[in-house]
Amino acid sequence: MLVELNEDNAKKAVESLGDGTAFAIANVTDEDSVTDCIKATIEKFGGIHIVVNCAGIGSASKTVGKDGAHPLQYFKTVVDINLIGTFNVLRLAAVEMGNNEPGEDGECGVIVNTASVAAFDGQIGQAGYSASKAGVVGMTLPIARDLARMGIRVNTIAPGIFDTPMMAMASDQVRSPLIEMTQFPKRLGLPQEYASLVKHIVENTFLNGETIRL
């Protein structure tokens, strides 16, 4: 089940993925919206075994800029979606995962969150974004410990500079220095490289409570 806010984008993605996929429209910050999405997923696929939290936004603004103090609403919105939205989805999904028939090692589900290297190496103007992603990193281990009794693993991926729609909106003047900062290879990460790590996390049943920089 692909969860999106934009219906047109969701339809295009499902069409490209082919059979065995569906989409639901939901706002990750809204409890009722996420609950409805989870119900739709269970009705369509019979249960929830894997959740990958990818919803996120960025907002570049210095703490004090030429127009004054950082707009507080920008900060709140980024934290609301990136951090609180992630927690909202995983907490509600975990309830349903707990109803699954345990598999190998008693596992009932896997949750993969998305942070960012900005959680560790935030740049100028990234206070809100870095704080939100650091929050995702910080809650990974405690939540993994919380959900261990239910047979649910929780891990987080902290991607570097990836070829995403958010990055596509940036100018070459912004993108080029970021690419130059990477060690090797000096290019943007690819979506399939992120997906490959998600697949490994799901398949490696001994991996839990960890944040992996990619």
Give short role names for the model-derived ranges.
Residues 35, 58-76, 95, 99-105, ...:
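Conserved mid-core segment of classical short-chain dehydrogenase/reductases
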Residues 116:
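Residue(s) in the substrate-gating loop at a strand-loop-helix junction
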Residues 90, 132, 140:
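Active-site helix of classical SDR
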Residues 7-8, 25-37, 72:
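The beta1-alpha1 cofactor-binding region of Rossmann-like NAD(H)/NADP(H)-dependent oxidoreductases
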Residues 57, 68-88, 112, 136:
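Catalytic Tyr-X3-Lys loop
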Residues 1-12:
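Conserved glycine-rich Rossmann-like NAD(P)H-binding loop of the short-chain dehydrogenase/reductase
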Residues 95, 145-146:
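Alpha-helical segment proximal to the catalytic Tyr-Lys
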Residues 190-214:
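C-terminal substrate-recognition "lid" of short-chain dehydrogenase/reductases
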